C-alpha cells in the first residue's frame, strides 16, 4: 500500500525545524561593554547559564517529540481530516515551546521561577494529550494504519503514550511547590524515551518503536 502521509510528514518536519530555529534565536550574544576582557566575558556568560540550560533541555525535548512523531507515522499509511487536525495540534503546541523556554531562561533565577516552570511543564501536558489524540484518531479507523499491524502492537503503542500523561501531569502539579523537581521529572522522562525502545511485532517482526 502506498503511503498517503508523505506531505503531512514533510510539513511536520518543516515545523519541527522552525521550532528548533526559534529556540536558537533566544540565545543572545552579550552586549559589548567598554573595557571588558576575557575574564569579564566569562563572568557575563556564566550569568546567562539559565538560558543555555533552557535551550538544551528544550532542544532535547523537541528532538524526542520529533523521533516519536516519526515513528508513529511509520505505522500510519493513510490520512483523514481528524488525523490531520490532531497532527496540526501537535505542531501548534511544538511551535510554542520557544516561548515558555524563554520564560524559563529569563525568570528561573528570580522569584517568578515557579510560574515559569509551571507554564513550561503545562505545555508538555498538552503535547502529550495531542499525541494521544493523534493515535486515537489513527486507530479509530484501522484502515489508516500500516498493513499487518497487530492489535497487540496498537495497544503497546497506545500504552507507550498513555503513561506519559500522568508523568507530565505529576510534574505540572509538583511545579507549584517544587519547580526544580518538576523539571527533573520531565528531563528523566525524556531520557527514558530516548534510551528505551519497545519491540512492536508486525508481520515481519522487525520494527521497534519508542
Residue ranges and their predicted role:
Residues 1-210:
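Multi-pass alpha-helical transmembrane bundle typical of ion/small-solute transporters
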Amino acid at each position: 500500500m502506498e503511503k498517503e502521509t508523505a506531505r503531512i510528514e514533510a510539513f511536520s518536519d518543516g515545523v519541527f525545524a522552525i521550532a528548533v530555529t526559534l529556540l536558537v534565536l533566544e540565545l543572545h550574544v552579550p552586549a559589548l561593554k567598554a573595557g571588558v576582557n576575557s575574564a569579564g566575558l566569562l563572568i557575563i556568560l556564566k550569568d546567562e547559564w539559565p538560558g543555555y540550560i533552557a535551550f538544551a533541555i528544550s532542544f532535547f525535548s523537541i528532538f524526542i517529540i520529533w523521533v516519536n512523531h516519526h515513528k508513529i507515522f511509520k505505522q500510519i499509511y493513510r490520512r483523514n481530516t481528524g488525523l490531520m487536525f490532531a497532527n496540526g495540534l501537535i505542531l501548534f503546541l511544538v511551535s510554542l515551546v520557544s516561548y515558555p523556554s524563554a520564560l524559563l531562561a529569563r525568570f528561573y533565577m528570580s522569584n517568578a521561577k515557579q510560574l515559569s516552570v509551571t507554564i513550561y511543564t503545562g505545555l508538555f501536558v498538552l503535547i502529550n494529550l495531542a499525541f494521544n489524540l493523534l493515535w486515537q484518531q489513527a486507530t479509530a479507523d484501522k484502515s489508516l494504519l500500516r498493513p499487518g499491524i497487530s492489535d497487540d502492537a496498537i495497544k503497546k503503542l497506545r500504552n507507550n503514550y498513555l503513561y506519559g500523561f500522568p508523568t507530565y501531569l505529576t510534574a505540572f502539579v509538583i511545579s507549584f511547590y517544587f519547580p526544580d523537581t518538576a523539571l527533573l521529572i520531565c528531563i528523566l522522562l525524556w531520557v527514558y524515551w530516548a534510551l528505551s525502545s519497545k519491540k512492536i511485532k508486525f508481520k515481519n517482526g522487525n520494527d521497534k518503536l519508542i
